[in-house]
Amino acid sequence: MFLEPERDKPHRELSGKAQPFPVPERIPIFPLPNVVFFPKTYLPLHVFEPRYRQMVADAAAGGQCIGMALLKEGWEEQYDGNPPIFPVGSVGRLASVQNLSDGRSNILLQGIERYEVREEFFEKSYREARITLKPRDRDFSMDSPLRRYLLGVLDEYLQTDEEASPLHSLIRPDVSDEVLVNSLSTYLDCTPLEKQFLLEAEHLPQQARRLSDLIQFKLAERRGAGGWG
């Protein structure tokens, strides 16, 4: 059985256009302690553990999908097993797979949609899950004042952080709201838990407001670190 994400008009992306893609109801899960994946973004990964090499091979030969999940706190004690994960993640399509001579691989995932885990399976060397897709409610879009506010906060942040200069490319009218918010959520210097908080927002305006609050908090931290005169 396949799950097909609901899609509105195609969004213009920074690195190409995502196409509707059928997502299997049961997918392999790639849990990591420091990665939160967002729809309409791209994620490069270097795969070296034997169990995840097998996962990539199976996904490439099957449904072409992998679900990224964030490991919960305390994962170190049982990493070789199946430590708990946050139930909400994003599923990606295998956009490219580069197999290396020693069995490792470099892959590129194209974010399709958020998902929620319904049931986990541990029959293979890697974890699988039965999922339900969680598309954002299209009735909740970012209005112009919210977009202007987010871009204003972002501009202020960029003036204080030269290393964040690549984010300047997002300040364009042709970048869709979804690409803007998810790309900022990906590349902003936030902790994995902060990014998970953004991913779990019920709709795009809520994610944008959470993102604005995080940027404001980081600005306040920098002002404090720099002193007040």
Question: Over which residues does each language-model region extend?
Answer:
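N-terminal low-complexity, acidic/polar interaction/targeting segments
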Residues: 2-229
